[in-house]
A protein has these predicted regions:
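AAA+ P-loop NTPase catalytic core and its hallmark functional loops
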Residues: 2-248
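Non-catalytic, well-ordered alpha-helical scaffold segments
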Residues: 64, 68, 142, 168, ...
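Short acidic/histidine-centered micro-motifs embedded in hydrophobic/aromatic stretches
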Residues: 173, 265, 320
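C-terminal engagement/docking regions of AAA+ P-loop ATPases
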Residues: 305-363
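Amphipathic alpha-helical interaction segments
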Residues: 77, 104, 131, 221, ...
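A diffuse structural propensity rather than consistent per-protein peaks
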Residues: 37, 116, 140, 155, ...
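Conserved AAA+ ATPase small/helical "lid" subdomain
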Residues: 233, 240-314
Length: 363
């Protein structure tokens, strides 16, 4: 399968030219088993410059210091915990950090309520285990064990979704940098370059608090929501362009005005305050994250291209916005109707969006 046919290439595949250019131009010392210096990793994440004739695109739009602290943590023996509400680019930053540092973002454990200890330690090929007994050949390493052996970065997504007793299996790995294998009478010791990047949020339902012992093994970096409307509009615009290209959606003249309108609605309902700060608003139950705004605009482009006139209009995004806001058909519907009547209806230039949103509710 060629890269062009992949629905979502890994960061090290999609941005291979940028990574190669930064490695070529990098004259600063790199930590053991790193492919580039910490300074070059930060340049890759923040972008906005041209290196060796290659434009380095921004992967993260936000305070530079946050990325510097994250990269500096990875250069030590401390694991990194990226903490934030849903939609603050935790997974995105984690993937790009791993791609820049080791060239491999695929050593991934996806945390769920059903994650078992074998996912973070090791498992067994039970056919060989029964036939031969415990052996290295019967051992099935987890991504974390593989990262320890190879001196790479393991990614642990949604750490707080994992049951607490499974979380605590990480303590020995993070503190002693070893993974005991009592069945074989041995252990795996981490080689230089090994580290763990975990992501977590404590806002969603169904999360498990981290124990104090485990939390002490991490340096925590909090990723905030975009600081300004302009920053969030830029993030949405860039990601929509990337996703539309990978999905090969028909070209649609993407209206900057429509993207700004979607982001404005999300920011106002998320904060419970209108953009001018004059009116307080009821807040819906959903998170209304930047990631959801990206999804709404991408869906709008598909609607416009396939069922509209090829221009992104309020009618194309209204259904997606209503779907993102109204998670609870009773309480959230009241919040949305009040917002439409009190804010959208009275706002200059928003009459078409008001009509489209009302049509969705009554369709």
């Amino acid at each position: 399968m060629t890269e062009a046919t992949l629905l979502r290439p890994h960061a090290e595949q999609l941005f291979a030219a940028e990574l190669a250019a930064l490695r070529t131009a990098d004259a600063l010392p790199a930590p053991p088993n790193w492919l580039m210096s910490p300074h070059a990793v930060v340049r890759y994440l923040l972008g906005g410059e041209t290196v060796e004739g290659v434009e380095i695109t921004p992967k993260y739009i936000g305070p530079r210091r946050i990325i510097e602290v994250a990269v500096a943590t990875l250069a030590t023996d401390r694991a990194l915990l990226l903490l934030g509400v849903p939609g603050t680019a935790k997974t995105w930053v984690s993937e790009h950090l791993a791609a820049a540092v080791t060239g491999d973002s695929t050593l991934l454990v996806q945390g769920t309520a059903g994650t078992v200890e074998e996912a973070v330690r090791y498992g067994w090929n039970y056919a060989r285990l029964i036939a031969e007994g415990p052996s290295q050949q019967a051992l099935v390493p987890s991504p974390i064990m593989t990262a320890m052996r190879d001196g790479k970065i393991a990614r642990l997504e949604e750490l707080t979704r994992i049951p607490s007793e499974v979380q605590d299996a990480l303590i020995t790995v993070l503190s002693e940098k070893t993974l005991p294998i009592p069945e074989l009478g041995g252990e795996v010791q981490a080689t230089q370059g090994f580290n763990v990047i975990a992501t977590a949020n404590d806002r969603d339902r169904g999360v498990n608090d981290l124990s104090s012992a485990l939390r002490r093994r991490f340096n925590t970096v909090v990723l905030p929501l975009p600081a300004s409307l302009d920053d969030e509009v830029e993030i949405v615009t860039r990601r929509v362009a990337d996703i539309s290209g990978s999905l090969q959606l028909p070209e649609v003249p993407t209206s900057a005005e429509e993207i700004r309108r979607v982001v404005t609605v999300f920011r106002e309902l998320r904060s419970g305050l209108t953009a001018d700060g004059r009116n307080k608003l009821k807040q819906p139950s959903g998170t209304l994250s930047t990631a959801e705004a990206i999804s709404v605009v991408t869906q709008g482009i598909a609607m416009s291209a396939h069922f509209g006139d090829g221009v992104l209009r309020p009618a194309d995004t209204a259904a997606g916005i209503v779907g993102a806001v109204v998670k609870d058909p009773v309480n959230d519907a009241v919040v949305w109707l009040e917002y439409l009547e009190a804010v959208v209806r009275e706002r200059d230039g928003w009459a078409d969006f008001y009509r489209a949103s009302r049509d969705v509710l009554h369709s």
